[in-house]
Amino acid sequence: MSGCRVFIGRLNPAAREKDVERFFKGYGRIRDIDLKRGFGFVEFEDPRDADDAVYELDGKELCSERVTIEHARARSRGGRGRGRYSDRFSSRRPRNDRRNAPPVRTENRLIVENLSSRVSWQDLKDFMRQAGEVTFADAHRPKLNEGVVEFASYGDLKNAIEKLSGKEINGRKIKLIEGSKRHRSRSRSRSRTRSSSRSRSRSRSRRSKSYSRSRSRSRSRSKSRSGSRSPVPEKSQKRGSSSRSKSPASVDRQRSRSRSRSRSVDSGN
């Protein structure tokens, strides 16, 4: 069976105990009301009344603000002291509870900067519940003075940025940044550097390819020119050899002609 203590999130800072009593009127006897800045706790005598209040009043308007109503975390044994002005840390849940119920991780992540070192993840989660349902919270890990908060919906994340950015927690004004935007900016810068390096390598490869092509073309042209010039001396050699081969024949013919002439002269005498 659920507990008797109910958490109120997104509570208007101007809300008073009378407003809270009027809001929960008709849901059973209230044992205690503990209001903080932006959130609060209501304790019923009967846990069934607390169940009904969570089921029917979650998302309703209280002092012109839609509040979130959910069961509060179990308090430690040492924090049972009652009273309307109880210590602000009495509503913390013990660390063992975190192990038993693992948090739900979502993509609706919010980065909290300039976080005081005195603020724990429990304090941060309770503070951020003013904006919506918080599924996960962590502080000072891995970076000091920085926290991470994840919401159940993107609308709660935007609501937190609009309402809680610049607010003070333990004397420090926090700065809220959407986690996806930070990741996108880093990925864009990395992609730009990668694209520039890739374009440089591509231009270099293109230059080397064009240079190799020009060199291969020049080599092919020189080879073609040398090939076209080489037959010329062969023709000249053929011409020279033919002229040389014809010269003995002409000598023989001249000799035969001279012999025939000499014979004709002798026969005439």
Swiss-Prot record:
BP terms from Gene Ontology: cellular response to insulin stimulus; liver development; liver regeneration; mRNA splicing, via spliceosome; positive regulation of RNA splicing; response to insulin; response to wounding
Inducing stimuli: By insulin and hepatectomy.
Protein's UniProt name: Serine/arginine-rich splicing factor 5
Chain positions with Phosphoserine modification: 86, 224, 226, 230, 247, 250
Stated family: Belongs to the splicing factor SR family.
CDD domains hit by this protein: RRM1_SRSF5, RRM2_SRSF5
Residue numbers bearing the N6-acetyllysine modification: 167
GO MF annotation: an example: protein kinase B binding
Keywords for this protein: Acetylation, mRNA processing, mRNA splicing, Nucleus, Phosphoprotein, Repeat, RNA-binding, Transcription, Transcription regulation
Predominant localisation class: nucleus
